[in-house]
UniProtKB/Swiss-Prot annotation:
Single annotated GO MF: tRNA binding
Binding site for Mg(2+) 1: E415, E422
Phylogenetic classification of the source organism: Bacteria, Pseudomonadati, Pseudomonadota, Gammaproteobacteria, Vibrionales
Official protein name in the record: Lysine--tRNA ligase
Entry annotated with the keyword Protein biosynthesis: yes
Reaction(s) this enzyme catalyzes, per UniProt: tRNA(Lys) + L-lysine + ATP = L-lysyl-tRNA(Lys) + AMP + diphosphate
Subunit structure: Homodimer.
Top enzyme category: ligase
Amino acid sequence: MTDAVQNETVQEENKLIAERRAKLDEIRKSCKANGHPNDFRRDALAGDLQKEFGEKTKEELEELNHVVAIAGRIMAKRGPFLVIQETSGRIQAYADKEVQKELKEKYQGLDIGDIIGVKGALHKSGKGDLYVNMEEYELLTKALRPLPEKFHGLTDQEMRYRQRYVDLIVNEDSRNAFVVRSKVMSAIRNFMISKQFMEVETPMMHVIPGGASARPFITHHNALDMPMYLRIAPELYLKRLVVGGFDRVFEINRNFRNEGLSPRHNPEFTMMEFYMAYADYKDLMDFTEELLSSVALEVLGSTSMPYGEDTVEFGGKYARMSMFEAIKHYNPDHAQIQALTEEDLQNRELMVSIAKSVHVEVEPFWTCGQLLEEIFGETAEPKLMQPTFITGYPADISPLARRSDDNPFFTDRFEFFIGGREVANGFSELNDAEDQDARFKAQVEAKESGDDEAMFYDADYITALEHGLPPTAGQGIGIDRLVMLLTNTHTIRDVILFPAMRPQA
């Protein structure tokens, strides 16, 4: 949009706002409650009326003479009909000539965006659409700002996120995405409770940030005069609860990570994290298959759904392969990768060479495990469209996971991928207090070497482990990324109601 066109648009909008303010000034003089009444009560929703009366004929409705009270926002004016939108859908209201005259006299006419209450008998138009005859009516809220002209939604993507309230009014797809999100949360919660998990709440502010490798947000507690951190993960508190005897716990809540913005990342995001005693990471993979197929079926009515140009299948058994196997599988023409052995994964010089050959910008403090993960992320992860568990994560990038009995370089850990992105991370928990102590110390050394995302040392958590953590498996599932898949959206901002935004210039 050129500056001239933009200025003209702003001037036109300001003119409309001034006209609407003038109308409201007149309404205040003649109407109760200073033009903002609060005594209208609706008794019906558009969606419910459609379900109950949508199949009835025009004659049947006239005979019924069923009177309803509806309320909502005016989205269109079509001759004598007003299209009214509320939470369940849309329905029309009919104003005969006498009512139209009254509306003009009382309210100086109604505008698109106004919120109105209507009471009257339910009828059906010649086209077969339900409508309510406007026998009683009241303007409940005068909209001072006009809505965007195009009903398919805002064309300015950034404005959709900054003014989500407008986006939700005019964009049905956006509203539906958040309805799906709400259903996903409910379905997950119900599933977990059905499996005898107890829902808990753990602190959002931590004295020591932990439970994940990430840079935290820092705040200050005035009364205690001490720094605190917004949590990056609830893991260490949830495992303390397992030590305390709660064998199955879960939490759905926000995490905060002081990192960049991208189509996959928002600094404030929602996770479902859960822990179950007397289980391992293989049990978790089976559990995840059951959970996700159940959620998809309950929310969408199917375990198969489109994502971009692909169709993803949440039902059945998911593919399983190690990270080492994945980079070999997805790099068939890379001679160095094809020649790799598991022993080579601990050869840092070789791993640096391979990482650079696939365009990874190597940091000097990266370990062999970090190099392997970066090679995987660059060459294999984007190709994992169907549900896939990737196992065989090295211990040096898994400081809270139990070491593999077969090879202590690896851990009993997996990450779950679908649609080319990670959605979940789970593992058999490290319950050896001495090993955990050593790994925390290694993380501190990494932080001192320049790794801002390395973990802090948590002495109280070590004390908890010394009291005895039973064999336990735990997992975190990214709710935002899961909802992206179930709504076929490709940016996390489309599934977060109010995403983080840079300040407007």
